[in-house]
């Protein structure tokens, strides 16, 4: 079959995009049982934590959801209906949600997409067959219309056991949730890896990694796994790097990094410690009004890497208004040594004198022009609001782009990849794009290309390929040209550039690179230069 590539480009770009710049539902804030209590839960545990959320001031700070994880069932009856473990929850679930709601809070519950829950280990009878598969409609009606829960996390241990298709089953559950009388339910998918771009139409948030545990190694690993998938957060739908381990055994500097990164990345903030015994430092960090404002910002954006030196990363995002005067910036030191980095103000999108406000100490710390030297302890971070005159972004990394066919589900399913390479501009590039392993919709998009006035630009793309390749360019759904032949002489260590003139509209633009008929080059970055 012939592939009419330019027509496909236009159709693909016409599909709906996230509502960048518009107010969206913010990430979930609350608490969950699993990190501290695991399967050791009961009615009194939940009530005491709900009480503590109010008494500690966490509820006033914005934390609202009290979420029950795995372990509350007593199997499923012969009639197919779920049975509650009434020894653990003698008053019943509706009485419990009524109590939580009476405190001005919201209540969350847990299930599995498949048959058995993770906590059952596939053997404990209470957790066998209690998952959603085959019972999507009636279980949702029980959880939301009868028990009156406001949130649900849906795991996938039983989904794997039942050999289900993630997209098909999670979509079925999503539709069942939407069909309930109760509205406004928050749906969190827990597949322990980014599921694919389809998930934004199905869930409010989705886990991007395996389970967190209370150690610096876990926090660091999860941060690094999320650095280059920030394009998938947007439009009120969020990457979820898992619950918070703050208030347990992490060192203060490690807790700072944990909280600061989760906040700037617009991740859900679900406390995992015992709120009745939370240490003062951890409590104050969780209630930090500036970090919470960073997390709950009306734009709901991810925070891509704008500068990197080894394992010191600078990530940033707009606050309050796209291309406005205020940006959130977090500088993270993931190494085991004290580090100093000169933060490039131009890379942040500013020119002239700028104001640096430190979110951890709630004070202005510097006003001036030029780069700003930030010294950070091992495992630590600094979080800032930076305010000043903006300049148009001119350098867009491939690893901050949105990839239509990207997923992390494995199972020998093809996918484009974000890959490390120190010869790339910031040490990362994107490969396996174009028609590869049968993928025809395997394209790259920069969805947040901002032009203050609009007009003509020269776009210069840095690429690598060892054989002749080509790619199509489109802007805002309109085909521009096909770049061919492209050749650099090597796939990894020799980079070449190619230029093309494009026209941007005033405001936000989407630039797409694609080839539904053949493999594309590896892509490093693209630079925009306004025509004179």
What are these regions (language model features)?
Residues 8-16:
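Bacterial N-terminal signal peptides
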Residues 27-33, 62-69, 106-111, 150-155, ...:
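Structural recognition of the beta-strand scaffold that forms the well-ordered cores
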Residues 45, 49, 53-163:
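Aromatic-lined carbohydrate-binding/catalytic grooves of carbohydrate-active enzymes
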Residues 135-138, 168, 179, 185-274:
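Glycan-recognition surfaces
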Residues 234-235, 239-310, 380-381, 389-393:
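Aromatic- and carboxylate-lined catalytic core of secreted/periplasmic carbohydrate-active enzymes
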Residues 262-265, 270-272, 308-350, 379, ...:
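Carbohydrate-binding surface patches
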Residues 270-337, 364, 413-437, 445, ...:
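Glycan-recognition and catalytic regions of carbohydrate-active enzymes
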Residues 339, 348-356, 367-532:
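Extracytoplasmic
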């Amino acid at each position: 079959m012939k592939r009419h590539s330019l027509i496909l480009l236009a159709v693909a770009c016409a599909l709906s995009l996230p509502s960048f710049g518009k107010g969206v539902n913010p990430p979930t804030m609350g608490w969950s049982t699993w990190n501290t209590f695991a399967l050791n839960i009961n009615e009194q545990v939940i009530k005491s934590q709900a009480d503590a959320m109010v008494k500690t001031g966490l509820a006033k700070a914005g934390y609202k959801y009290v979420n029950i994880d795995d372990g509350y069932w007593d199997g499923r009856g012969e009639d197919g209906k779920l049975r509650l473990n009434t020894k653990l929850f003698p008053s019943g679930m509706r009485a419990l949600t009524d109590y939580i709601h009476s405190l001005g809070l919201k209540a969350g519950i847990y299930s599995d997409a498949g048959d058995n829950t993770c906590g059952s280990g596939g053997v404990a009878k209470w957790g066998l067959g209690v998952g959603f598969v085959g019972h999507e409609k009636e279980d949702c009606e029980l959880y939301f219309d009868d028990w009156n829960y406001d949130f649900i996390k849906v795991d996938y241990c039983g989904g794997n056991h039942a050999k289900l298709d993630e997209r098909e089953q999670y979509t079925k559950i999503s539709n069942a949730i939407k069909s309930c009388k109760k509205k406004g339910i928050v749906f969190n998918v827990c597949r322990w890896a980014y599921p694919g771009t389809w998930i934004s139409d199905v869930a409010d948030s989705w886990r991007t990694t395996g389970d967190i545990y209370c150690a610096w190694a876990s926090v660091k690993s999860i941060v690094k796994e999320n650095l280059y998938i920030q394009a998938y957060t947007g439009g009120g739908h969020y990457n979820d790097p898992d619950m918070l381990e703050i208030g347990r055994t992490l060192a203060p500097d490690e807790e700072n990094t944990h909280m600061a990164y989760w906040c700037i990345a617009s991740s859900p903030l679900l406390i995992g410690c015992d709120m009745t015994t939370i240490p003062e430092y951890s409590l104050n960090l969780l209630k930090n009004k500036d970090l919470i404002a960073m997390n709950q910002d009306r734009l709901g954006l991810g925070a891509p890497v704008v500068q990197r030196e080894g394992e010191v990363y600078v990530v940033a995002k707009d606050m309050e208004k796209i291309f406005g005067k205020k940006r959130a910036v977090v500088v993270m030191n993931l190494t085991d040594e004290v580090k100093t980095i000169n933060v490039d103000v131009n890379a942040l999108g500013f020119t002239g004198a700028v104001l640096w406000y430190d979110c951890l100490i709630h004070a202005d710390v510097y006003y001036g022009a030029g780069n700003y030297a930030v010294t950070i302890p091992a495992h630590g971070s600094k979080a800032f609001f930076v305010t000043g005159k903006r300049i148009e972004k001119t350098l867009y990394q491939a690893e901050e782009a949105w990839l239509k066919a990207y997923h992390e589900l494995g199972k020998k399913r093809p996918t484009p990849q974000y890959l490390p390479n120190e010869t790339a501009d910031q040490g990362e590039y994107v490969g396996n794009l174009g028609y590869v392993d049968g993928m025809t919709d395997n394209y790259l998009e920069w969805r947040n290309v901002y032009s203050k006035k609009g007009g003509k630009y020269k776009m210069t793309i840095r690429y690598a390929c060892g054989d002749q390749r080509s790619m199509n360019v489109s802007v805002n759904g309109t085909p521009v040209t096909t770049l061919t032949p492209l050749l650099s002489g090597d796939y990894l260590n020799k980079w070449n550039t190619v230029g093309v003139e494009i026209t941007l509209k005033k405001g936000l633009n989407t630039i797409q690179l694609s080839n539904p008929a053949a493999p594309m080059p590896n892509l490093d970055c693209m630079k925009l230069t306004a025509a004179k």
